[in-house]
Amino acid sequence: MAKAIMVQGTMSNAGKSIITAGLCRIFAQDGYKVAPFKSQNMALNSYITKDGLEMGRAQVVQAEASYKEPDVRMNPILLKPTSNRTSQVIVNGEILGNMPAGDYFKYKTKLIPDIMKAYNSLAEENDIIVIEGAGSPAEINLKQEDIVNMGMAKLAKAPVLIAGDIDQGGVFASLYGTYMLQSEEEKQYIKGTIINKFRGDLKILEPGLKMLEDLIHIPTLGVVPYMDIDIDDEDSLSDRFSNKNSGGDVDIVVIRLPRISNFTDFNVFEYMEGVSVRYITKPSQLKNPDLVILPGTKNTLGDLKWLRESGLEASILKYAAEGKPVFGICGGYQMLGKTLKDPWHVEEGGEISGLGLINAETVFEREKTRSRVKGQFHHLSGIFEGLNHKIFEGYEIHMGITTPLGGEAFTSSLEAMDGGVKSDGLCSNNIYGTYVHGIFDEGQVAETIIRTLMEKKGLVYEPNKNFNMVEYKNKEYDKLADALRKALDMEAIYRILNEGI
């Protein structure tokens, strides 16, 4: 069985996911078979495995850092919020159902057998499991029947490292308070603290580290600097979403819906020379972009109402009426149609009108479509005509069927992992919609779109032919590992790992 170590945090966004990924890469570099694990993740961004199962993206990143194929066992429970009080509960990659927070709180301990089956299975195949907590173990209102922080540490007999974010201020108080709010039994699991996101002179910080150690009698295992490392991380969303500047030759606007999901769909554009990607929430921020993207969402009906009430719907309709391109993905695709119907109350129930930019209607179904797919574009016209015959790959995660109302032809044929074939995508000159997440990741798709947009402006697109996304990601994981090796007492961490509980 594998040895285990766990990273918890004093708060959300303390850097647990990144530190976990970095430790995974370090252990893998040192020759160990390593796997990440998070018993329960709450996120709007998910991933479809090769088996067609759904898991959190943070564990996908950690799996990549471990040189492993993402495996649903790494994240047996995924909660996807559908409203402020309700989440879709996904267990072992399959939908269990929608639950209000109170009902899930009472139910969650029934999932411990699923958690431990997944954990023990991974532990049998690996040398080291790096476990990530969620939120903070100091949330004493959630301590009862905890399955993700100290509760998980006890189940796995895993020593715990507590990370605190000094960039937010109050790191000593948060580390001290987190420790003091644990029971005497739980305190025995905490073997070290980590100061994360530090900027400045370390010598000025050192007296505080000594005082903290004197107070809680737990060593500080390192001070991790604020790092400029490009890794898909939900903790860094605020940095990505805060970009409102249109600094590139091609300006792409993504509508930042309240429940935006799978934001990684647009990462590929951020690596392209001369392209800027902005996330906006107000009509005044729209300006005059070259492309508007309506992204996926975990609550299409609710976010469509928000789009309408915010005034962005009117702005998008005016933009589209000028012949400028709008691209919708998944929930964004559904919004582009004329009508959305929810007879089974998958979301809010009822019927609502869409933007009417595509002659189609969507009916929400109780069963989720969930598959990795390969496809090819055809029957495209207007600004997207250059995509015809291009190949793409991606994945579907949705609970609706979109049907053209006037006999319009679908614009792509999809082949699923099980060999099934179906149609997807609708185009109306400057408007395009698809259910496929990751559709831009195939280089020629993104490059064709950017080349077309540049040609409209009399510019020439020169692709970076030397760029390889897999190589780029691995270099970033290596940079992260190097930074953590320099910042952390890895000898002490290995000792903690080997001694266990």
UniProtKB/Swiss-Prot annotation:
A GO BP term, please? cobalamin biosynthetic process
A Pfam family it matches: GATase_3
Q: Which CDD domains match?
A: CobQ_N, GATase1_CobQ
Q: Which PROSITE patterns match?
A: GATASE_COBBQ
* Active-site annotation: C330, H437
User: What keywords is this UniProt entry annotated with?
Assistant: Cobalamin biosynthesis, Glutamine amidotransferase
The pathway noted for it is:
Cofactor biosynthesis; adenosylcobalamin biosynthesis
Q: Which domain of life is it from?
A: Bacteria
Would the keyword Signal turn up in this protein's UniProt record?
no
Domain named GATase cobBQ-type: residues:
249-445
The GO molecular function terms of this record are: ABC-type vitamin B12 transporter activity; catalytic activity
The record's function comment reads: Catalyzes amidations at positions B, D, E, and G on adenosylcobyrinic A,C-diamide. NH(2) groups are provided by glutamine, and one molecule of ATP is hydrogenolyzed for each amidation.
- Sequence similarity: Belongs to the CobB/CobQ family. CobQ subfamily.
Name this protein carries in UniProt? Cobyric acid synthase
